[in-house]
């Protein structure tokens, strides 16, 4: 995003924005403790649940700042969240990071490079990038202040123990910034680029938490996460339209002869159903392409990722079962179907 030259650092750090950011941060943290991310993860060992809950709290906070705050405050709040993320990474020293978390002395689950944080020039999707993070846990700023927001402070144990790079968190913030200025996607490629920011970072963070991040696994994870994001978009077409957003690629709407007025109808016309069926099949193919990641993992990591894959398949099955009418009611899978798909993915490794 292009920085707004008229918005100064002083404006971004106003007390009003700070108060709102703190309130949203606290609420997101409470949601992370009370909700399922996803349901299957409640059965994981406590150390993993804590790290995943912290990541979920951060992601929810970014989403809430981008969706639920007053429209005129959203970019300021996201700036503050990113600045606080920068404080977190500046205060962490490599001396705090266990050898195994740095990929040293591990077997079969090395994290690989933890480089990849925001470079000193900033992320193209970022307006201020929260300061230089040094690229990974270990960049030291002895004179820096600690994070102010609860959801950012809660990330510290996971970032240190699992050597999670900064970039995925910055990408999640960039996705929410994009939501403030982009409400339509001309092409499918444009939508995939958005998913690269809004969905794929979560999978990469999860792999780091389980000590399982490798380039091959990250590539497969990206396919799974993009498919999950697409499934959610197709479930929520009506809700997104009420919020002023359409994630269906405009080129696909044109191909099937659909208009925005069609999407505002109480039920889906045949041409809309055909469009959703096309998008559902494409998301399913993407999910199936990434699903072999399950077979590359063991133990808790395998169970967690099987939960994501199974949940995605159940969501897509619900869309199909609705006759691809996502306008009359939001299609949601039942718990039994989710559990069945999880077990199947875990057992087959895909």
Task: Tell where the protein language model's regions lie, with residue ranges.
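Catalytic cores of Mg2+-dependent Asp-rich isoprenoid enzymes
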Residues: 1-109, 141-229, 234, 238-350
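Small-residue-biased low-complexity repeat regions
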Residues: 20, 105-113, 117-144
């Amino acid at each position: 995003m292009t920085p707004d030259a008229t918005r100064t650092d002083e404006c971004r750090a106003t007390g009003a924005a700070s108060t709102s950011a703190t309130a949203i941060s606290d609420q997101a943290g409470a949601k992370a403790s009370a909700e399922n991310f996803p349901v299957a993860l409640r059965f994981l060992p406590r150390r993993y649940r804590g790290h995943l809950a912290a990541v979920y709290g951060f992601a929810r906070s970014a989403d809430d700042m981008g969706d639920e705050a007053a429209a005129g405050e959203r970019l300021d709040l996201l700036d503050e969240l990113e600045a606080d993320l920068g404080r977190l990474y500046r205060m962490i020293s490599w001396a705090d990071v266990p050898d195994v978390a740095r990929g040293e002395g591990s077997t079969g689950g090395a994290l690989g490079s933890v480089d990849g944080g925001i470079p000193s020039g900033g992320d193209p999707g970022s307006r201020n990038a929260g300061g230089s993070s040094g690229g990974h846990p270990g960049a030291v700023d002895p004179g820096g202040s600690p994070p102010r927001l609860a959801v950012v402070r809660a990330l510290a144990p996971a970032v240190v123990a699992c050597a999670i790079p900064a970039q995925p968190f910055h990408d999640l913030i960039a996705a929410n910034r994009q939501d403030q200025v982009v409400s339509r996607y001309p092409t499918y490629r444009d939508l995939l680029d958005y998913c690269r920011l809004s969905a794929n970072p979560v999978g990469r963070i999860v792999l780091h938490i389980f000590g399982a991040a490798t380039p091959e696994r990250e590539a497969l994870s990206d396919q799974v996460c993009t498919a999950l994001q697409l499934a959610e978009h197709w479930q929520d077409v009506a809700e997104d339209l009420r919020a002023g957003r359409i994630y269906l690629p405009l080129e696909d709407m044109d191909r099937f002869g659909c208009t925005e007025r069609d999407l505002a109808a109480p039920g889906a016309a045949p041409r809309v159903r055909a469009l959703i069926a096309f998008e559902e099949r494409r998301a399913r193919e993407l999910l199936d392409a990434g699903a072999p990641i399950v077979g590359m993992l063991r133990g808790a990591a395998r169970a967690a990722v099987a939960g994501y894959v199974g949940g995605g398949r159940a969501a897509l099955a619900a869309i199909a079962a609705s006759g691809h009418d996502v306008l009359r009611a939001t299609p949601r899978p039942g718990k039994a179907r989710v559990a069945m798909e999880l077990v199947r993915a875990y057992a087959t490794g895909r």
